[in-house]
């Protein structure tokens, strides 16, 4: 399964928040009726028409895992480049991303430490401070919050990235990228583990001091989000993980 989004950021945001601000979705960019829309008919009503992010879904209806799903998802994303936006700097976009199932086989090969059975651990990419010292402090704060929520941090992985594809503005505010792996010593799995992680993630977003500000697009036992301040073609180029067929 893959869910692909090309985002629109509807309001100005501080530069330091841009990489996380691409989670913002517009819900009503069309304020006036479009005369070209069809008339109300059946369940359709033009009043419900709104401009927003472009979203595609790619899945295997038989539940077969395949890297083709990721590949087709990235292709669908690139076909929706018109749903994103750029300014005068054509190689800095306002955001794009992909949500996929946790690639357990791949993560076991690259994590560098032992992982529990699928569903018994969670993973997410953290957008940490670009300064190495502040990022280290943020990691310590995150581990403390996780422990306070009854969770155990299994470890961190530095996410490989290639910023050479990005525009100057995106590089100027680029955070550092770390994958966080978490489990519950009490044995919570799946949706039960995700509920505990939701609380921890919200605490991380609200409790860390400004210099340690960290954002997790996702933190889940079931799915993982790769996203950033991209034009749609830049996503796959920036994250080499997405090219790995495992």
Regions found by a protein language model. Give the residues of each.
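N-terminal segments that mediate ammonia production and transfer
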Residues: 2-246
């Amino acid at each position: 399964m893959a869910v692909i989004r090309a985002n629109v950021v509807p309001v100005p945001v501080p530069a330091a928040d841009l990489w996380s601000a691409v989670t913002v979705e517009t819900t009503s960019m069309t304020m006036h009726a479009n005369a070209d829309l069809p008339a109300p008919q059946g369940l359709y009503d033009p009043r419900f028409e709104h401009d927003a992010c472009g979203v595609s879904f790619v899945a295997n209806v038989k539940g077969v895992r395949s890297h083709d799903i990721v590949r087709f998802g990235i292709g669908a994303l690139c076909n929706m480049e018109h749903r994103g936006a750029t300014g005068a700097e054509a190689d800095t976009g306002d955001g794009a991303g992909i949500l996929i199932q946790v690639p357990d086989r791949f993560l076991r090969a690259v994590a560098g430490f032992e992982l529990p059975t699928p569903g018994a651990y969670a993973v997410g990419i953290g957008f940490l401070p670009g300064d190495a010292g502040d990022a280290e402090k943020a990691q310590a704060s995150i581990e403390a919050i996780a422990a306070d929520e009854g969770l155990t941090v299994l470890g961190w992985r530095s996410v490989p990235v290639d910023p050479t594809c990005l525009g100057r503005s995106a590089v100027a505010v680029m955070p550092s990228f770390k994958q966080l792996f978490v489990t519950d010593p009490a044995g919570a799995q799946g949706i039960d583990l995700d509920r505990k992680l939701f609380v921890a993630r919200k605490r991380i977003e609200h409790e860390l001091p400004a210099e340690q500000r960290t954002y997790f697009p996702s933190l889940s036992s079931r799915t993982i989000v790769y996203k950033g301040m991209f034009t749609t073609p830049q996503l796959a180029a920036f994250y080499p993980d997405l090219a790995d067929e495992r």
